[in-house]
């Protein structure tokens, strides 16, 4: 599953911002627009027992250039909410459900 960081029109968004995957699938987050973005999972909004630090990018680490990617596999079933730390205040948030 590929998720774009930044809409094609320049909007600060994950595209898609809500989606489903099967446990163990790889999710590739790809910088689409060239603004600095990252992917941080909210430790309070992921399945119990999952370590947010192990699935998130470090908050100071950014995908700066178009085409740069960050990949993650989620094994525990449930709903995970994530955000871009520089743009969370602008509404750049999303969620994935692992089935």
Curated annotation (Swiss-Prot):
Keyword Metal-binding: yes
Gene Ontology molecular functions: copper ion binding; electron transporter, transferring electrons from cytochrome b6/f complex of photosystem II activity
Keyword Transport part of the UniProt annotation: yes
Cellular compartment(s): Plastid, Chloroplast thylakoid membrane
Key words, A-Z: Chloroplast, Copper, Electron transport, Membrane, Metal-binding, Plastid, Thylakoid, Transport
Residues binding Cu cation: 37, 84, 87, 92
InterPro entries in UniProt: BlueCu_1, BlueCu_1_BS, Copper_blue_Plastocyanin, Cupredoxin, Plastocyanin
Cofactor list: Cu(2+)
Bilayer topology annotation: Peripheral membrane protein
Signal peptide range: none
Record GO cellular component, one term: chloroplast thylakoid lumen
Domain Plastocyanin-like: 1-99
Record family assignment: Belongs to the plastocyanin family.
Function, as annotated: Participates in electron transfer between P700 and the cytochrome b6-f complex in photosystem I.
Protein name (database record): Plastocyanin
Record organism: Vicia faba (Broad bean)
């Amino acid at each position: 599953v590929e998720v774009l960081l930044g809409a094609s029109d320049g909007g600060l968004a994950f595209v898609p911002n809500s989606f489903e995957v099967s446990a163990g699938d790889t999710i590739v987050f790809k910088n689409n627009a060239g603004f600095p973005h990252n992917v941080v999972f909210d430790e309070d909004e992921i399945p119990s027992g999952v370590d947010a630090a192990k699935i998130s990018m470090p908050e100071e680490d950014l995908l700066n250039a178009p085409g740069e990617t960050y990949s993650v596999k989620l094994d525990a079933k449930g709903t995970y909410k994530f955000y871009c730390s520089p743009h969370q205040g602008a509404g750049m948030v999303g969620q994935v459900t692992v089935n």
